Curated annotation (Swiss-Prot):
The protein's name in its UniProt record: Cell division protein ZapD
Pfam families named among the record's database cross-references: ZapD
GO BP terms: division septum assembly; FtsZ-dependent cytokinesis
Role, per record: Cell division factor that enhances FtsZ-ring assembly. Directly interacts with FtsZ and promotes bundling of FtsZ protofilaments, with a reduction in FtsZ GTPase activity.
Entry's localization field: Cytoplasm
Amino acid sequence: MHTQVLFEHPLNEKMRTWLRIEFLIQQLSVNLPLADHADALHFFRNIGDLLDVFERGEVRTELLKELERQQRKLQAWVEVPGVDQSRIEALRQQLKTAGSILISAPRIGQQLREDRLIALVRQRLSIPGGCCSFDLPTLHIWLHLPQEQRDAQVETWIASLNPLNQALTLILDLIRNSSPFRKQTSLNGFYQDNGDDADLLRLQLALDSQLYPQISGHKSRFAIRFMPLDSENGLVPERLDFELACC
């Protein structure tokens, strides 16, 4: 059982979007293979949410900019004595490859957007109980196809996101590993500090404290208020130790 709980909080809109995309892509695989109605609806709901996120901004443009920014950051490390040059070069090549694949890929989500079954289910998801067999006979018969046939179709849908997912995973790994965790202490449940142009806050709390952080702020400055899970009887200690990374 985990003794620490990790919280992540974006400090700008692009990071907020990326974390949502990462979460939704991870959710696509949770209930595979799609063996029943509940598993299928979970899958299609996450597909629909992903398409909604894609339609709100220039996801590919922001990722390509970030891939270039990370390459420049790695270039600055080349001249630092003692740095593992082979590791730096390997990461730069990964960034270049991810960028080339992403820029040559079709519009993000286009294959999913044009799929008839996904479109039909997506239309009905906003209606309470709108995915019954009489509302969606297409989904009903699809769920009665051989498992292997459904698995192959699901695999094709997920694979269409690979160019995006590979670039996003690489970027988030680099950002998350850009700063170590450091011990901090809050006073009376409150902590604030400068963001130093960070994109992401990562905070670790002891599980047995049964506290969670409410974080506000941006890349220049942020504030953290610790709240008890039990809002009526829970207590926040006068001094609370936690670990924080500004990435």
